[in-house]
A protein has these predicted regions:
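Amphipathic alpha-helical coiled-coil segments
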Residues: 1-70, 77-88
Length: 91
């Protein structure tokens, strides 16, 4: 019984740590997405004013797409961490 209790505490600690890490990843991904969107807006404006090239716009679009993908992956990791945490606390 003592071994099982120690194991549950270790699992709870790991799940709590993972949950905190993934929540931070979501916050960071949100910030990066906002920055990528702002950059895309600025580059698009500059392009329309003749100050930036199409390559600059495409690069900004790619960065925005990557930021969105990273945000989705962060959300997924956070949901998985929450599921693991709930599993551990229900044991």
């Amino acid at each position: 019984v003592l071994f099982r209790s120690d194991n549950i505490l270790e699992e709870l600690s790991a799940a709590t740590t993972k949950l905190a890490e993934t929540e931070q990843q979501v916050r960071t991904a949100r910030e990066n997405t906002a920055l990528a969107e702002e950059n895309l807006d600025l580059v698009t404006f500059s392009y329309n004013e003749g100050k930036a090239s199409m390559v600059d716009v495409l690069s900004a679009q790619l960065s925005w797409t990557q930021a969105q993908t990273n945000l989705i992956n962060a959300y997924l990791a956070a949901k998985m961490a929450m599921a693991e945490y709930r599993k551990v606390i229900s044991e």
